[in-house]
């Protein structure tokens, strides 16, 4: 069986945000799947999805500092029509990716003990973000 839903994440400031609970809350009400896969596709080119540490928020802060240093806003980019944070946001989105494929068992995501779903908001003012969630399973 296949199920699909478009969900909208609340607006977040620039940085990395743990969104596991927000995702699972917005997917509540879907029929339970004994064994399956959840595919998440972020419909934006200036944000990203990744799995990482779900407990210590300093990991998210360190990750943001790393990417601000590695892909700075003030570099000489040709694509700068939407501001200094636009092209760096596209680069970070491409490096980290915009989709995740996650196993589901007995109606629950099967993540490691310390794993959580992160949204990387790479724009200073990114706005709400849309994700297409596709659940396949039996």
From Swiss-Prot:
Gene3D superfamilies: YjbQ-like. Disulfide bonds: none annotated. It holds the Pfam family UPF0047. Transmembrane segments: none annotated. InterPro entries: UPF0047_YjbQ-like (IPR001602), YjbQ-like_sf (IPR035917). Belongs to the UPF0047 family. This is UPF0047 protein YjbQ. It comes from Salmonella typhimurium (strain LT2 / SGSC1412 / ATCC 700720). The gene is yjbQ.
């Amino acid at each position: 069986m296949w199920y699909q839903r478009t969900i909208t994440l609340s607006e977040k400031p620039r940085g990395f945000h743990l969104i596991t609970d927000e995702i699972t809350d917005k997917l509540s009400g879907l029929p339970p799947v004994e064994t399956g896969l959840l595919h998440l596709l972020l419909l934006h080119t200036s944000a990203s999805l990744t799995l990482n540490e779900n407990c210590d928020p300093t990991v998210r802060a360190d990750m943001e500092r790393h990417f601000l240093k590695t892909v700075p806003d003030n570099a000489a980019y040709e694509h700068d029509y939407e501001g200094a944070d636009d092209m760096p946001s596209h680069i970070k989105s491409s490096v980290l990716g915009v989709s995740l494929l996650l196993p589901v068992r007995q109606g629950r995501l099967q993540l490691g003990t310390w794993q959580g779903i992160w949204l990387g908001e790479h724009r200073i003012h990114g706005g709400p973000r849309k994700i297409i969630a596709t659940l396949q399973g039996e």
